[in-house]
Amino acid sequence: MSFSQESGTHHNSLDYAGVSDEEDEIDILGEDDPCSLKSHFYLQPTHSDMGDSGMLSPSKLSCTESESDSSGESEGGTSKDSPATSPGGKAKRALVKPPYSYIALITMAILQSPHKKLTLSGICDFISSKFPYYKDKFPAWQNSIRHNLSLNDCFIKIPREPGNPGKGNYWTLDPASEDMFDNGSFLRRRKRFKRHQQEFFKDGLMMYNSLPYYRPYSALQPQPMLQQTPLACMAIPETLSMPTNLTPYPDIKRKAHYPDQGAHRGFEGQDANNHPNKSQSKCSFSIENIMKKPKEPEPSFPSFNSHWNYNNHLLQRPSSCFLPAVLNLSTGPLLANVQGTRQYNLIKFPGSY
């Protein structure tokens, strides 16, 4: 007995017994139906304009909604077959960050260039063309490339040549950093490269205009210094003094008999210990000392005592190492011993403080 035949025997209402019989038949039919008819079928009053199936008509929309609810897609969000999320999700999963450090990426870019040197823009172009991840993230990582170039010793900055116009300097690899990566693999470095102090000196020579700075710094040879141990100071005996005002030899010979009164007063107070006279022990600022004509001291020539022990390396040095006033000691009495005084003018030589 089919469902349509059972519904045709009733006209306006159903008995309680009739309803129970129909529910038993619905259970039988629900065994093969993918929708659970017990929970989703419901009774509706029949109308004249409805067909035979209008009394107990399961809604297809309710069935499809039940399927979607049972799968958990209608309440949980969008379905797996949604075209909006699947292409975007697949595209994001495809852009995986490469397992290389920035130093490895820069090294790849420099090694593939014909001249083994590139600018910052050339390095960024190479990385963007080889790795889609960095192409999508550009220019967020450009500053990281710039910082790695300037902070790592394995990269050398080469200024542009005068006849090569353009923007930015070139960057190349240090020749001593070729074994920086383990077995040529860019995935792992052996150790951090450190440049030696001598190589720092060579790198500094490249910045001068008079040198071929466009060459690699390894081709430059350090210039030998003219004087390895410059003369700092020269030991002068205590008996050696030097006049304050340097004058030529004829003037010194002429003025030696007429010294200044101020210098004589300064020397007079210091010679009191060597010549204990009552006249010299008086105050140097008295009227008698000021009005009295000073004695004319005899000029004395420099006396080289036995305790003058000059080293051979000082005597063998060129004359340009000494002051011009000390060049000609034998030509005139430039240095005089003034009555054994111990107040001298210190001679400062180049390099002394």
Curated annotation (Swiss-Prot):
A GO BP entry: nervous system development
Chain residues forming the annotated DNA-binding region: 97-191
Low complexity bias: start-end ranges: 73-82
Biased composition (Polar residues): 271-281
GO MF terms held by the record: DNA binding; DNA-binding transcription factor activity; DNA-binding transcription factor activity, RNA polymerase II-specific; RNA polymerase II cis-regulatory region sequence-specific DNA binding
Localization annotation: Nucleus
Presence of keyword Nucleus: yes
Tissue: Expression is initiated at the late blastula stage in the presumptive dorsal marginal zone, prior to blastopore lip formation. At the onset of gastrulation, expressed in the superficial layer of cells in the dorsal blastopore lip (Spemann organizer). In the open neural plate, expressed dynamically in a row of cells along the dorsal midline that are destined to become the floor plate of the neural tube. Only weakly expressed in the posterior region of the newly forming notochord.
Annotated CDD domains: FH_FOXD4-like
Principal localisation: nucleus
Function statement: Transcriptional repressor. Controls the convergence and extension movements of medial neural plate precursors during gastrulation.
Protein name per UniProt: Forkhead box protein D5-B
UniProt source species: Xenopus laevis (African clawed frog)
